[in-house]
């Protein structure tokens, strides 16, 4: 059985491809999906399944485009209210292709529709190989419980406790844990930089899995929650509907200085992606600097939101292309 993690450092986001006997599934794909198409072609896989562990809030997923380009079925928690054709996941549902067997667990708490995926290699069927936990269980942390507009953080934290203690922590200690995010993500507070773990290690080291009562857990998880970025709710709705294909986005053209000034004066944001030192030396008056290093797209979304017209400033066309792609990953397209 084939298993591969794809880690997008700039968003601290992990996605996965599982394959066997010519068929593959992709779990929690990033918006630009070429990486999965190329990997599938390299191994002779047909991508037949796209699985979302939940409606992501911190990035725009590629599930809709990947399904459109491959004919794959999209699997998503039944409570997501998705507005595109999909297979609704219920607790205990199973999917098998080749030697790869998937069992779905409904694990609400981070979001109401969250699911985890237990992966078993049928050539070694005595114990599951891994569990893909989405944003329910991280390495060293658990998902924040404040992303639902219909439920309180206390209600979600209680559900998260039940999902962890009644389902995920019942798995054998040797089962590998692969989450959807690592350190730097805004979906948790104390995530490790490690990209995988085991159920046993998390039981022993994860602060949120200390042997607390349900009441103590809820109090711990809801105390001093960091502010929820404003764009999170917008990304959830984009993912609920399915993002427009990146291939349909218009090409960018270079603008003369007078046009840049005119657009700025009309309300556009001039976003300077150069380093702070280069920006400090010379920049367009009124422009905002968010450098490409680090969490560029997340910071841009926090500072600017998703609905303003953006004029990009960068050293060269390659940097412009990078800046634009990274912005589209969080839903900034204008």
What are these regions (language model features)?
Residues 1-46, 117-119, 124-134, 140:
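Conserved beta-strand hairpin/beta-sheet module of binuclear metal-dependent hydrolase folds
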Residues 65, 74, 86-117, 138-139:
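Active-site-proximal cofactor/substrate-binding loop regions of enzyme domains
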Residues 29-30, 55, 79, 111, ...:
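Active-site metal-binding loops of divalent metal-dependent hydrolases
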Residues 33-75:
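Active-site metal-binding motif and surrounding structural segment of the metallo-beta-lactamase
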């Amino acid at each position: 059985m084939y298993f591969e993690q794809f880690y997008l450092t700039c968003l601290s986001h992990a996605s996965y491809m599982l394959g066997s006997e010519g068929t593959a599934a992709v779990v929690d794909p990033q918006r630009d999906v070429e990486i999965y198409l190329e990997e599938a072609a390299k191994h002779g896989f047909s991508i037949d399944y796209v699985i979302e562990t939940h409606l992501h809030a911190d990035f725009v997923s590629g599930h809709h485009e990947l399904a459109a380009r491959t004919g794959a079925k999209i699997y998503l928690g039944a409570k997501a209210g998705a507005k595109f054709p999909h297979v609704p996941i219920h607790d205990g549902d199973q999917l098998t292709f080749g030697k790869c067997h998937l069992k779905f667990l409904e694990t609400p708490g981070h979001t109401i529709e969250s699911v985890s995926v237990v992966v078993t290699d049928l050539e070694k069927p005595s114990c599951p190989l891994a569990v893909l936990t989405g944003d329910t269980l991280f390495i060293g942390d658990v998902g924040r419980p404040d992303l639902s507009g219909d439920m309180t953080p206390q209600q979600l934290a209680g559900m998260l406790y039940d999902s962890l203690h009644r389902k995920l922590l019942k798995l054998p200690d040797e089962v590998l844990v692969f989450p959807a995010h690592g350190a730097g993500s805004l979906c948790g507070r104390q995530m490790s930089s490690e990209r995988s773990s085991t159920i046993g290690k998390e039981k022993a080291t994860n602060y949120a899995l200390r042997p607390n009562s349900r009441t103590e857990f809820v109090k711990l998880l809801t105390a001093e929650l960091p502010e929820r970025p404003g764009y999170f709710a917008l990304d959830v709705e984009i993912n609920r509907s399915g993002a427009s294909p990146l291939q349909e986005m218009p090409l960018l053209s270079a603008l003369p200085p007078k046009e840049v000034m005119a657009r700025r004066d009309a309300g556009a944001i001039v976003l300077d992606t150069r380093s702070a030192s280069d920006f400090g030396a010379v920049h367009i008056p009124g422009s905002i600097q968010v450098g490409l290093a680090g969490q560029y797209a997340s910071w841009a979304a926090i500072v600017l939101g998703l609905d303003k017209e953006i004029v990009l400033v960068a050293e060269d066309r390659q940097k412009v292309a990078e800046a634009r792609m990274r912005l589209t990953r969080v839903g900034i397209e204008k």
